UniProtKB/Swiss-Prot annotation:
The lineage of its organism: Viruses, Riboviria, Orthornavirae, Duplornaviricota, Resentoviricetes. Residues 246-330 are annotated as: Disordered. It comes from Rice dwarf virus (isolate Fujian) (RDV). Keywords: Capsid protein, Host cytoplasm, Outer capsid protein, Virion. Disulfide bonds: none annotated. It holds the Pfam family Phyto_Pns9_10. Minor outer capsid protein. This is Minor outer capsid protein P9.
């Protein structure tokens, strides 16, 4: 593969950062998602540097929200090969120094090269180990590996679930994560620091809500699935998230939006769930909140980010044709006869 010139290396990381900055929840559901195609292309050209690039995207404030949505998508998709997007391509590292190139890319994009979240050391180590392990373990041989893809799917989902749980635990103290913000004495610097702190806090809380909502939805859809790989993944989620009776016992019930609709089994009561838009607050909105909060009396923190929610019935479009007896293999057979493309299964190209 050889070493990449700085210009090309910066372009690759530029594409990754920009994609995660604009990543929308549910990109994996789209057959021709530009975001997924771009990430697949970057992955195919950066070799063993892929986990280091993902790690930087996880902890940088500009790409953090999008990266976590990407991980949530992989953890809750029916595309059993989507986890291969975490695997590296080839056995060479074309970068001389990934972190240095990442810093140069931030400057090229007009981003601060020191706006990195400060996760607890234990999670930082765990996240790095997770991404390095997936770099190797998420690879699938396109000739022989497809035959046991369901087994690999279960193992990968278990690993991703543990990563999300570790993130959830590490992000309980949002103030700790924003401790990197150290403004100077100028008015603009103080305001910008407050804006960034408000933005990071909002995004971390949003990610925590998305995790609990989407994990719960996956469990409700697949814990009784007749397809063993979906059922096993759902059962492992139940164990990891201490779910009892369809509600995460140790986790708050999050606010919901169009992308975050919780889905539970039909019950006698199906109240309406409020809807919103899955978009982070824009800078102007955050700026107004910060300036307003200066004059407002301080309030005690609420007991938790909890909002009552109803129990909506299962939506028909949430049910997959693959959640039927032998549905998955029938689906593969039918699609193969119709010139089936493995990318539609969520299998990222490995070469």
């Amino acid at each position: 593969m050889g070493k990449l010139q700085d210009g090309i290396a910066i372009k690759r990381i530029n594409d990754a950062i920009t994609t995660f900055k604009n990543y929308k929840l549910g990109e994996l559901k789209q057959g021709g998602s530009m975001a997924i195609n771009t990430l697949s292309n970057v992955r195919a050209h950066v070799g063993l540097a892929w986990p280091a690039i993902l790690r930087n995207c996880l902890i940088h404030t500009s790409s953090h929200l999008g990266f976590m949505k990407f991980m949530i998508d992989i953890a809750t998709t029916w595309k059993v090969g989507a986890f291969t997007l975490l695997g590296s391509v080839g056995d060479e590292d074309p970068f001389t120094d990934v972190d240095l190139i990442y810093t140069k890319t931030c400057l090229h994009l007009g981003l601060k090269d020191n706006d990195f979240l400060q996760f607890p050391e234990e999670f930082a180590y765990e996240a790095n180990s997770f991404l390095e392990a997936q770099s190797m373990n998420a690879k699938v041989d396109m000739l022989t590996g497809v035959h046991n893809i369901e087994d690999k799917y279960v193992f990968r989902m278990q690993s991703i679930s543990k990563f999300l749980k570790a993130y959830y635990t590490a992000s309980e103290d949002v103030a700790y994560l924003t401790g990197f913000i150290k403004p100077d004495d100028s008015k603009d610097s103080i305001l910008n620091a407050e804006l960034l702190e408000a933005q990071v806090t909002s995004e971390v809380l949003r990610v925590r809500n998305l995790i609990t909502t989407k994990i719960q939805k996956y469990i409700n859809l697949y814990e009784d699935s007749q397809l063993p790989h979906f059922r096993q993944a759902a059962l492992s989620y139940i164990q990891d998230w201490d779910v009892d009776g369809g509600v995460p016992a140790a986790l708050p019930q999050p606010d919901t939006t169009d992308d975050e609709r919780p889905v539970t089994k039909p019950g006698p009561s199906t109240p309406t769930v409020s809807k919103g838009v899955d978009e982070p607050e824009d800078e102007e909105m955050i700026r107004k909140k910060v300036e307003t909060s200066k004059d407002a009396p301080s309030k005690a923190d609420p007991p938790g980010n909890v909002s009552p929610r109803g129990v909506p019935a299962l939506l028909e479009d949430d049910m997959s044709e693959m959640d039927m007896p032998d549905g998955f293999h029938d689906y593969l057979t039918r699609e193969h006869e119709n010139n089936f493309d493995l990318s539609q299964l969520g299998l990222a190209p490995s070469v």
